Regions:
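Short, histidine-centered active-site or binding-site loop motifs used for metal coordination
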Residues: 7-9, 40-42, 139-140, 197, ...
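A generic secondary-structure signal for well-formed alpha-helical elements
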Residues: 61, 68, 96-99, 138, ...
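Short helix-capping/linker segments at secondary-structure and domain boundaries
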Residues: 98-102, 135-142, 245-255, 283
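Internal, conserved structured core segments that host functional sites
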Residues: 112-161, 165, 185
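Conserved nucleotide- and phosphate/pyrophosphate-binding catalytic cores
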Residues: 149, 155-331
């Protein structure tokens, strides 16, 4: 089984990114042939600063490696180093319906009332995402719940292509974790934790110092009750339960049983301590990896060479199926 996923190099990685995506990347190395990339081409669909983007690519790559990605057990690269992604995106756009793209939730959220002013790249973002995955004939796509619609679109694109041009592309499946898929903002638990749309005190970053993490959890919004349990009117406590369950690798029911006699203050401290212990080794490894930028660049370049060997074969198959370019023997 082949696994593919990517992560944007925008902003610092927060606890939601880590639990919802990065831990799945690491686990994927044991489930099959894992291919991961830092998707810098997606990052340029909104306003950005070039120098900051390059730094963010390195920061993101270092975080992923610190979390446990092993270039000896997976293919890990920078998206823009593999031009097959962009050519395949253009070819797939010919079988992607305008209406499908117009219904994408993330496009509506990011474009807001200024839809006529946003880039065409933001609108066609899901097609590039489809190309990212389909280029590698991936079966399994680990994503957060908010990306489910994008995986459904890439499935539709692959099925439409195969129906029109013959069986060429593998139709992927989304893999969404049962616990922690959506870690919410500590100050506004009705919305997910976010680097751009979240609150400063409500977002816990992977590289936060221990004191900052503890402070954020101590001030986390809860409710006027006292029971450590999930419920429709207990979004804040429910979020903390899910966070603790995720970092411990247990079910939320186990957390509820363990802390049923605890008060909110003690429970918040327990969650904070668990998160500090969970992230401390990652922060230390990140700092060491990030200090060797030349070594980090070599790792990404080596991964890109391996990725191109696969993506170029897929692109050739797609071109041949569509009648684009000279006739060549198909694999």
């Amino acid at each position: 089984m082949r696994i593919f996923s990517g992560i944007q190099p925008t902003g610092r990685k927060h606890l939601g990114n880590y639990i919802g995506a990065i831990t799945q990347y690491v686990a994927g190395q044991d489930r099959g042939e894992a291919i991961y990339c830092v998707v810098d081409l997606h990052a340029i669909t909104v306003a950005y600063e070039p120098g900051a983007l390059r730094e963010s690519v390195y920061d993101t790559a270092a975080t992923l490696l610190a979390a446990g990605l092993d270039p000896g057990r997976c293919i890990f690269f920078r998206q823009s180093d593999v031009p097959e992604h962009t050519e395949l995106c253009w070819l797939l756009s010919s079988v992607t319906a305008f209406g499908d793209l117009n219904r994408m939730h993330q496009f509506k959220e990011k474009s807001g009332a200024q839809r006529d002013l946003v880039s065409a790249g933001l609108f066609t973002y899901p097609v590039l995402m489809a190309a990212d995955v389909l280029a590698y004939s991936a079966h399994d796509v680990p994503v957060g719940e908010d990306q489910r619609q994008h995986v459904e679109l890439m499935r539709d694109v692959a099925e439409r292509f195969n129906a029109r041009f013959g069986e060429t592309l593998v139709v992927p499946e989304a893999r969404i974790p049962q616990v922690g898929a959506r870690i919410m903002d500590l100050q506004a638990p009705e919305r997910k934790m976010s680097t751009t749309g979240g609150s400063a005190q409500g977002t816990v970053y992977v590289l936060d110092e221990p004191a900052a993490i503890v402070k954020k959890f101590r001030s986390a919004v809860t409710d006027s009750g006292s029971e450590i349990a999930r419920g429709p009117d207990k979004a804040g406590i429910g979020n903390l339960i899910d966070i603790l369950a995720s970092v411990r690798g247990v079910g939320p029911e186990q957390v509820e049983r363990e802390f049923r006699a605890s008060g909110y203050g003690a429970f918040k401290q327990a969650v904070a301590d668990a998160v500090v212990d969970y992230l401390a080794p990652v922060r230390e490894r990140h700092n060491a990896i990030r200090a060797d930028e030349a070594g980090l660049e070599r790792t990404l370049a080596d991964g890109a060479d391996k990725a191109r060997a696969i993506a170029s074969d897929t692109l050739l198959d797609v071109r041949q199926a569509m009648g684009v370019g000279p006739v060549r023997p198909r694999r």
